[in-house]
């Protein structure tokens, strides 16, 4: 038996998220089917992040156990010939048997892209969140800085979260603008259900003047979901990297 680790990039537009579901096309199921076609084995592909419907990944990490004799570094080449164009195995390697993509992860980095323009982009409509309002970018930057550190993020999680604790540590946060694209990045030891999208939705309300930047600490301390902004759409969100 061998343990193979994959680093995966995918466009989540046409998938009902990562995790297998009955009667729905998912990223996990699509890759598992490709592995079965390659090795004849029915495997359980473990993903580091269970991304939602429409969310993309630049660096999803997954692993599976196999009895196949295919060298670990050749799985990427073989699987890419079998997978659809919107899923790419960027890297594959054999790892220790105790490696677990989800439970061994020490942190993750996410990116959210906003297309800030009067009119939407036909080419970027599934890869960015279109916002036509003029944004107060400096206020959004100030607001973003308040998320750094260790906090109880109850105000920034959707109902249905199975997490035992809502305390998380954010180690890095940035907000940059290049022409019409606003890029938000955030890294931390873990994220609650929809946490990144709710943070982005809150920053958007700062940008249009509905929430003041200096209100963010109060919203965090309130631990009340209704105090934060709405959940930003899935199409602008990317899983960038998983840390081990």
UniProtKB/Swiss-Prot annotation:
Its EC number is 5.4.99.12. GO terms for biological process: tRNA pseudouridine synthesis. Substrate binds at residue 110. The active site is at residue 52. Signal peptide: none annotated. Keywords: Isomerase, tRNA processing. It catalyses: uridine(38/39/40) in tRNA = pseudouridine(38/39/40) in tRNA. GO terms for molecular function: RNA binding; tRNA pseudouridine(38-40) synthase activity. Formation of pseudouridine at positions 38, 39 and 40 in the anticodon stem and loop of transfer RNAs. Homodimer. Belongs to the tRNA pseudouridine synthase TruA family. This is tRNA pseudouridine synthase A. It comes from Acetivibrio thermocellus (strain ATCC 27405 / DSM 1237 / JCM 9322 / NBRC 103400 / NCIMB 10682 / NRRL B-4536 / VPI 7372).
């Amino acid at each position: 038996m061998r343990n193979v680790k994959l680093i995966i990039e995918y466009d989540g537009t046409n998938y009902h998220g990562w995790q297998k579901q009955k009667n729905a096309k998912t990223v996990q199921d699509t890759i598992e089917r490709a592995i079965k076609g390659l090795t004849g084995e029915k495997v359980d592909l473990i993903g580091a992040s269970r991304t939602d419907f429409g969310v993309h990944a630049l660096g999803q990490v997954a692993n599976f156990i196999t009895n196949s004799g295919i060298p670990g570094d050749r799985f990427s080449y073989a699987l890419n010939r079998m997978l659809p164009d919107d899923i790419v195995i960027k890297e594959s390697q054999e790892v220790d048997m105790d490696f677990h993509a989800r439970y061994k992860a020490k942190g993750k980095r996410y990116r959210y892209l906003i297309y800030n323009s009067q009119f939407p982009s036909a080419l970027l409509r599934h890869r960015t969140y279109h916002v036509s309002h003029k944004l107060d970018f400096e206020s959004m930057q100030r607001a973003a800085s308040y998320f750094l550190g260790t906090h109880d993020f109850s105000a920034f999680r959707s109902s249905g979260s199975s997490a035992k604790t809502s305390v998380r540590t954010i180690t890095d946060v940035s907000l940059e603008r290049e022409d019409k694209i606003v890029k938000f990045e955030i890294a931390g030891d873990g994220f609650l259900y929809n946490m990144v999208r709710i943070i982005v939705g809150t920053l958007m309300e700062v940008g249009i003047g509905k929430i003041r930047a200096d209100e963010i600490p109060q919203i965090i301390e309130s631990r009340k979901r209704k105090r934060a902004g709405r959940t930003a759409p899935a199409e602008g969100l990317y899983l960038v990297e998983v840390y081990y």
